[in-house]
Swiss-Prot record:
Protein name as catalogued: Putative pterin-4-alpha-carbinolamine dehydratase
Keyword S-adenosyl-L-methionine: no
Residues passing through the membrane, by range: none
Keyword flag Transmembrane helix: no
Catalytic activity from the UniProt record: (4aS,6R)-4a-hydroxy-L-erythro-5,6,7,8-tetrahydrobiopterin = (6R)-L-erythro-6,7-dihydrobiopterin + H2O
Top enzyme category: lyase
Family the entry assigns: Belongs to the pterin-4-alpha-carbinolamine dehydratase family.
Enzyme Commission number(s) from the entry: 4.2.1.96
Length: 103
């Protein structure tokens, strides 16, 4: 279930489309994505950059790391454990950081 603060359905559908295209999936009221990097160091550097952004947003992911892979789940505990606009915003920021890692 998605709980979007913005009531504009076109804007909500557009955001949903963007996340589908970036391969985020929704499962059990969570946005989920796995990232793969060249090696452990690159994966950990990515996690450090995400941690800074997440802390500034006061919205923190559930994540795991195994060697060069980072698995991330997002939902909003304060909204009852559902996906909200905060999750989409953090996912967008995470994708931006991942693309920066590609370059």
């Amino acid at each position: 279930m998605y709980v979007l603060v913005n009531k504009n359905p076109c804007n909500s559908l557009f955001k949903l489309f963007l996340f589908i295209m970036n391969k985020w999936t929704e499962q059990n009221n969570r946005l989920i994505k796995q990232f793969q990097f060249k090696d452990f160091k690159e994966a950990f550097e990515f996690m450090k950059r995400v941690a800074v952004v997440a802390d500034k947003m006061d919205h923190h992911p559930y994540w795991t790391n195994c060697y060069n892979k980072v698995y991330i789940e997002l939902n909003t505990h304060s909204a009852g454990g559902v996906v909200t606009k905060k999750d989409f915003s953090l996912a967008e920021a995470i994708d931006t950081l991942a693309h920066e890692s590609d370059n």
